[in-house]
Amino acid sequence: VAPTGIAALNANGVTIHSMFQLPFGAFIPDHSDPQFFESTKFETKSTLKRHFKMNGVKKAVIRNMELLIIDEVSMLRADLLDAMDFMMQTVRKNSFPFGGVQILFIGDLLQLPPVVKDEEWRILRNHYRGKFFFHAQVLVQFPPLYIELSHIYRQTDERFISVLNHLRNNQITNQDIATLNQFVKPDFDLRANKGFICLTTHNAKAD
């Protein structure tokens, strides 16, 4: 599973919301009454249990599950992981974390962060120290084993790898800038050249 549709497609999986029949919105990890704040609805353990609907086939998949892989975990919100944990415990009728299923988290925490609206965070901050998956109450109580993969397979140029790592950690040097500037072509003519890729920061600029 994965937090977003694109990430799920890339992993040949499904989204967390689809797999566990979770409504969109924020999740408060207790049994308090649901709240509405402007345009945001807050689910709780009570509302999820009351409105929970899942077909028999999906329940069987979850009850027979031994290992669940969650990809692109940098985008996984703490409250969504707690909601998933609650649903797995409910379906499997097992009070162990994630209903006793082993969870494998995969991702790069320096990539895209979770998306949490300001109005959501004003409520969620009363329950969480942060927005990332490792701030989820289930992982605060039961910390996972972290394994860092250090070998780079996509690049072979050591200088380029060094530049990328410095950019990744916000430690860019003058030497890195000089290396990148070697490939700058200020006289490049867009009209006279075809087949190039133009990267922008926003969709509006790309359009």
Give the location of each predicted region.
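Conserved ATP-binding/catalytic motifs of P-loop helicase motor domains
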Residues: 1-207
